[in-house]
């Protein structure tokens, strides 16, 4: 593929150096993270981060590893840059990686292959506010409409919405792992359209 990079050519860094570099870069508007994920690599967990520089039109990729069962908490990038929460929540959910100082580390999608099998919808950590004048309104995950199924939980005081919690991903059902089972571009396109909903 044009522009592809070999895995062996991706620079490997220490997490502390990556964290400190991102802490400064993400303060600038021209940088944003395109993807941040982890995957098993023997007895290790290998993390990949793809950073885009919109001003210079550059794609930067870095990787770091930690032992798969290492219980050392990583400093959370979400605490500094809230947009990182989806990436860190998915990594935490899939591999039980702890991110120190991460605000409200709730599960993202409950995939079938999640590491913490005790984490279920029955003990999902919904955000709560106590008060006699408050009420909750739950909508979904099945609702009339063409958008992706989702659960929406409103906490209201009269007609004012104080908090809205959105839970999406109900129709993914492990579709990401289906992509890895085929190299057929037509099959991959059909899978992508199947999860895209009204944006297909």
Per-range role (PLM):
Residues 1-164:
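Terminal low-complexity/charged segments
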Residues 138-200:
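Active-site- and interface-proximal helix/loop "cap" or "latch" segments in soluble metabolic
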